[in-house]
């Protein structure tokens, strides 16, 4: 009865190929996620480039503004090591997700939870995605509400206080009705590749401005940069970069770094719509997106740190506002970052809506009415949270730390350990165990830091 051991009934939710190991690996790398030959023959499906832009948009958000502060508290080499480690772990966790999708023949994070732990597993994964993405979207909209009026007022030549376009709530509602809701209504995440490419170029522009402005801010820093441009001195301790630096502030860098490459809720929907989908092709999409995001992260953090050194603000643009208050490039990059954050909202809206639909309407066929009403309901919820819960980022700090840790580290490692038929001492299972352990430690550490921060305040 050797054959029965290799059937799908061998263990609920796990498919094991009857091919030889070498042949199985090769087939797995290039096997399609879905049996969709008619689609392959047509031109439908998102291209490799648009899929890369979508993954990068899912990765990069407002967190890029805090990375220079992280470098100041860890040192250049310490930051580089942590950033590279997190990027590799994120890539490996995506690798495990894709491998499980191939072997279980499912196409969603939620269904992986179903295969691993039954209906409770599916509900837990879907609930985690919904909470994480609603928290992220609300936080992004709160940034828009608080920062966009200030950015607009800096651009205007005279005082326009009291004008409707400087009212954060009014701007937020207009933007959500005119931009966020229409983009969120799109039925396929691949359609957002064009807006994601725009968001990525905004981030690249931000990094370029940070590089250029390194030579516009004097060192040692003075509040009157115009009169001190020629007083630049690298002879003082204030202007010497630290390769390694550890202090009590350094521990706060770990949660920020750990969540720098969170894209896992969007990876599988992007995978499903990829043209000629295969595990190898989607892994290349993910690796390309992570590598480009790593490059933008590192360049902006490095030159942001080398501009302000120990005086770098927790949000990098605040430093430029203080020392270059009327600089045209800085004002432009503020608007670009805000629009980049805005264009991320529809992308992370897609997995949240999908998770909600899978919990409530999994047995129903697609309906435009149901699709539109669910989209509208989610948009109303995140707008209300952004308007009426001013400390939304603090509220979702604890929840976000735990849900992000689960989605990046815990779930991929745990599901692989549960579903895999490999020997426990195999490299993949040991890697999955390491991922699970890392997630548990990072998640617990993040929660402790957030609670201590609340107590100190």
Swiss-Prot record:
The keyword Lyase does not apply. GO terms for molecular function: active monoatomic ion transmembrane transporter activity; inorganic cation transmembrane transporter activity; L-glutamate transmembrane transporter activity; L-glutamine transmembrane transporter activity; monoatomic cation transmembrane transporter activity; secondary active transmembrane transporter activity. Coiled coil: none annotated. It holds the Pfam family Aa_trans. Glycans are attached at residues 234, 284. InterPro entries: AA_transpt_TM. Disulfide bonds join 219-239. GO terms for biological process: amino acid transmembrane transport; glutamine transport; inorganic cation transmembrane transport. It is found in: Cell membrane; Synapse. GO terms for cellular component: plasma membrane; synapse. It is a multi-pass membrane protein. Amino acid transporter with an apparent selectivity for L-glutamine and L-glutamate. May facilitate glutamine uptake in excitatory neurons. The transport mechanism remains to be elucidated. Belongs to the amino acid/polyamine transporter 2 family. This is Solute carrier family 38 member 6. The gene is Slc38a6.
């Amino acid at each position: 009865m050797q054959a029965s051991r290799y059937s799908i009934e061998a263990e609920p939710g796990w498919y094991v190929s009857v091919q030889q190991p070498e042949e199985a690996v090769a087939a797995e790398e290039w096997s399609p996620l879905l049996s969709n030959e008619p689609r392959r023959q047509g031109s439908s499906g998102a291209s490799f480039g648009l899929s890369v832009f979508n993954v990068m948009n899912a990765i990069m958000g407002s967190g890029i503004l805090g990375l220079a502060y992280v470098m100041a508290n860890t040192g250049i080499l310490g930051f580089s090591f942590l950033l590279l480690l997190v990027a590799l772990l994120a890539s490996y966790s995506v690798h495990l997700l894709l491998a499980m999708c191939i072997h279980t023949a499912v196409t969603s994070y939620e269904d992986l939870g179903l295969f691993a732990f039954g209906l409770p597993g599916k509900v837990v994964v879907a609930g985690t995605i919904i909470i994480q993405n609603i928290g992220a979207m609300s936080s992004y909209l709160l940034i828009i509400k608080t920062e966009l009026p200030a950015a607009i007022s800096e651009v205007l030549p005279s005082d326009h206080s009291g004008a409707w376009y400087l009212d954060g709530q009014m701007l937020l509602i207009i933007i959500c009705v005119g931009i966020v809701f229409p983009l969120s209504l799109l039925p396929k995440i691949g359609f957002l590749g064009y807006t994601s490419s725009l968001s990525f170029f905004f981030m690249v522009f931000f990094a370029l401005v940070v590089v250029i402005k390194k030579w516009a801010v004097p060192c040692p820093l003075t509040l009157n940069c115009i009169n001190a441009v020629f007083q630049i001195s690298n002879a003082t301790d204030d202007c010497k970069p630290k390769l390694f630096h550890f202090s009590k502030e350094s521990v706060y860098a770990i949660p920020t770094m750990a969540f720098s490459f969170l894209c896992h809720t969007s990876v599988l929907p992007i995978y499903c719509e990829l043209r000629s989908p295969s595990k190898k092709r989607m892994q290349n999409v993910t690796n390309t997106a992570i590598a480009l995001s790593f490059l933008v992260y590192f360049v902006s953090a490095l030159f942001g740190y080398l501009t302000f050194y120990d005086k770098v603000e927790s949000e990098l643009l605040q430093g430029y506002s203080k020392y270059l208050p009327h600089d045209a490039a800085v004002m432009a990059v503020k608007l670009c970052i805000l629009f980049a954050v805005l264009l991320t909202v529809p992308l992370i809206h897609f997995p949240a809506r999908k998770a909600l639909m899978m919990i409530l309407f999994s047995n129903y066929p697609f309906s435009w009415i149901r699709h539109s009403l669910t989209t509208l309901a989610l948009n109303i919820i995140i707008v209300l949270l952004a308007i009426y819960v001013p400390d939304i980022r603090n509220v979702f700090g604890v929840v976000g730390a735990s849900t992000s840790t689960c989605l990046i580290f815990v779930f991929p490692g745990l599901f692989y350990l549960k579903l895999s038929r490999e020997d426990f001492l195999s490299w993949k299972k040991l890697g999955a165990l390491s991922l699970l352990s890392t997630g548990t430690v990072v998640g617990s550490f993040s929660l402790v830091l957030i609670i201590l921060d609340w107590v100190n305040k």
